[in-house]
């Protein structure tokens, strides 16, 4: 497979503000989780039980080097608050959750906000009924939309394309979404969870448009599959 081409490697490592350590004591974290859970339970009397609330923090250091002379690294941090509860009505029970993740703990919403949203989401699931088969517009909430985009990213990945196991083989330049859909890859957004100055081969990350007005504009390829497919990483 070989290394990525030397001219594609990152020449500099920009500061993307990915590292914001959170020196929180365990007792303080427990207090935040308790506030979060209480807000969920207090949201509605139909919220009857909790599956738990959590507060977490992590720090990491990513370093990559190769025999082309590349050596780069950067620190990063992730902090989160989450809560999951159970609601009951007329003998039926539903479970849902809410969470928040940020590079900087100062950017997290208040624990009570996370808990209240967990309660709201759970109660909203009560009383649902099945629809008859129909053709109708569908509005996807952000949580579901992220999953749909995840399926797109899997379908345009090098391995799936090379094995021809993707439904988007030979789809470059063709419509794959409605014309109102545009999807950008923006790896240099400060504090963003997936921002990075280089990929896992040391290749410099760049902004690009994956879908433009519904038309597929690019694939996600590492060096190995890019060479197999006669394309660029």
PLM features per residue range, with description:
Residues 215-233:
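C-terminal, non-catalytic macromolecule-binding modules
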Residues 1-207, 212-215:
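Active-site bordering "gate/hinge" segments
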């Amino acid at each position: 497979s070989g290394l990525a081409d030397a001219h594609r490697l990152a020449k500099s490592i920009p500061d993307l503000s990915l590292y914001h350590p959170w020196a929180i004591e365990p007792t303080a974290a427990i207090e935040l989780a308790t506030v979060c859970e209480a807000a969920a339970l207090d949201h509605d009397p139909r919220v009857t039980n909790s599956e738990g609330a959590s507060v977490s923090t992590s720090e990491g250091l990513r370093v990559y080097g190769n025999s082309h002379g590349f050596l780069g690294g950067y620190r990063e941090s992730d902090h989160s608050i989450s809560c999951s509860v159970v609601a009951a009505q007329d003998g039926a029970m539903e479970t849902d959750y809410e969470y928040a993740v940020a590079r900087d703990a100062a950017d997290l919403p208040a624990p009570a906000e996370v808990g209240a949203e967990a309660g709201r989401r759970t109660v909203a699931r009560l009383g649902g009924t099945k629809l008859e088969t129909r053709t109708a517009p569908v509005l996807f909430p952000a949580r579901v939309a992220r999953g749909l985009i995840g399926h797109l990213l899997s379908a345009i990945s090098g391995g799936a394309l090379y094995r021809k196991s993707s439904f988007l083989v030979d789809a470059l330049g063709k419509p794959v979404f409605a014309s109102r859909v545009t999807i950008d890859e923006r790896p240099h957004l400060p504090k963003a969870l997936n921002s990075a100055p280089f990929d896992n081969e040391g290749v410099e990350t760049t902004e690009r448009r994956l879908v433009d007005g519904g038309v597929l504009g690019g694939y996600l390829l590492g060096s190995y599959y890019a060479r197999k497919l006669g394309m660029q990483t």
